[in-house]
């Protein structure tokens, strides 16, 4: 496994992260399974562990605390706060400072550590001002309890607002974002990935296999934990895309999951899939994606099968008439070789003129 530099930091992170939602009591894994999965991930070179104070009502963190007791510093340990963990307590949810402080202390205790390598804000709480979130996170960084901060499930414009505010006020900006992104849901390409490029934010991807659909198991009639509906998508939606993934996998002699993960790794910028597993065989297949590089023809086939419209204002701004009015009649003779402009991202990174 290779490593990526985490955004505008010097931290080195593996090209796959291990998701540990299944380590919680909700999943009822055999007692020795989490240890085996963690060892397998580490032996493959993985060093990023993704968990949350909400997974299994804290039991996923407790399990990790036990497993990492003698090897804590070998991993980049990340966890999250925001989601409700104490029903009945009106302040036991949200992005606000009180929930951050209480949740972080509980996570440190369960994980048996004195610091979190990266603390994610799990989802946007629109009641809490962005300034409160960023200042509260900065306080935890300055206290040494958190090394880096990340943001998950926020609108792209608010992530941009948050990092701009942090930079202007000398606070700690988000070092990474975590988003939902896969071959069945490419909506992130319109706003999130261009924004991430502008801010040097790596994208950690949850749901990279679309709740197992991109493994092809539902086409084979197998059952799964999200058998009927998952995150608003009916079971049969996207079957044509899954069939294309399966076709390419058969041509390559690889599992479909590896094709789906390799496609994510081929995306521009730093895209790091968060892989989870309930069995060692599942994890073995997912880890095997790191040595698969899809060729241009297969990438083109997948793009054709899954592309989403760019939408407004992107298509509008690229109409030839608008281009001439915005840039003048000499626009085709102007060379822009800068690498960090919004133009280079929004227009060129993902889209071709239609």
Predicted regions and their residues:
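N-terminal binding-site loop/beta-alpha segment at the start of enzyme catalytic domains
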Residues: 1-75, 210, 344-354
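Aromatic-lined glycan-binding groove of carbohydrate-active enzymes
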Residues: 188-223, 255
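Active-site beta-loop-alpha junctions enriched in small/polar residues
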Residues: 21, 52-54, 80-84, 121-124, ...
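A short acidic, helix-capping loop that chelates divalent metal ions and anchors anionic groups
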Residues: 21-25, 84-91, 282-285
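Short, well-ordered coil/turn segments that N-cap beta-strands
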Residues: 11-16, 45-47, 71-75, 113-117, ...
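Terminal-tail/helix-coil boundary detector
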Residues: 198, 224-247, 251, 266, ...
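Glycine/proline-rich, positively charged
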Residues: 27, 39, 43, 87-184, ...
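Conserved, mostly hydrophobic/aromatic
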Residues: 6, 18, 34, 49, ...
């Amino acid at each position: 496994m290779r490593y990526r530099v985490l955004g505008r930091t010097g931290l080195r992170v593996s090209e796959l992260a291990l998701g540990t939602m299944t380590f919680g009591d909700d999943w009822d894994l055999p007692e020795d399974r989490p240890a085996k999965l963690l060892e397998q991930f580490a032996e493959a070179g993985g060093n990023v562990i993704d968990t949350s104070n909400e997974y299994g009502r804290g039991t996923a963190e407790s399990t990790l605390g036990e497993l990492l007791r003698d090897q804590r510093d070998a991993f980049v340990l990340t966890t999250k706060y925001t989601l409700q963990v104490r029903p009945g307590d009106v302040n036991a949810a949200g992005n606000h400072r009180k929930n951050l402080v209480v949740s972080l202390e509980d996570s440190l205790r369960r994980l048996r550590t004195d610091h979190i390598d990266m603390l994610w804000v799990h989802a946007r709480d629109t009641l809490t001002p962005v300034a409160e979130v960023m200042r509260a996170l900065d306080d935890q960084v300055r206290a040494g309890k958190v090394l880096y901060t990340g943001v998950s499930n926020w609108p792209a414009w608010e992530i941009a607002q948050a990092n701009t505010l942090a930079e202007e006020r000398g606070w700690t900006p988000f070092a990474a974002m975590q988003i939902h992104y896969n071959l069945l849901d490419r909506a992130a390409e319109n706003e999130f990935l261009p924004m991430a490029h502008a801010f040097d934010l790596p994208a950690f991807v949850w749901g990279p296999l679309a709740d197992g659909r991109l493994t092809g198991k539902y086409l084979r009639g197998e059952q799964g934990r999200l058998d009927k509906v998952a995150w608003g998508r009916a079971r049969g939606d996207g079957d044509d895309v899954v069939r294309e993934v399966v076709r390419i996998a058969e041509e390559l002699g690889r599992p479909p999951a590896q094709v789906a993960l390799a496609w994510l790794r081929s995306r521009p910028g730093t895209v790091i899939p968060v892989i989870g597993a309930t069995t060692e065989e599942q994890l073995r297949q997912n880890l095997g994606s790191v040595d698969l590089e899809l060729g241009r023809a297969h990438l083109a086939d997948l793009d054709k099968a899954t592309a989403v419209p760019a939408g407004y204002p992107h298509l509008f701004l690229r109409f030839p008439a608008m281009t001439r009015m915005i840039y003048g009649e000499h626009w085709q003779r102007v060379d822009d070789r800068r690498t960090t402009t919004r133009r280079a991202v929004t227009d060129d990174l993902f889209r071709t003129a239609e």
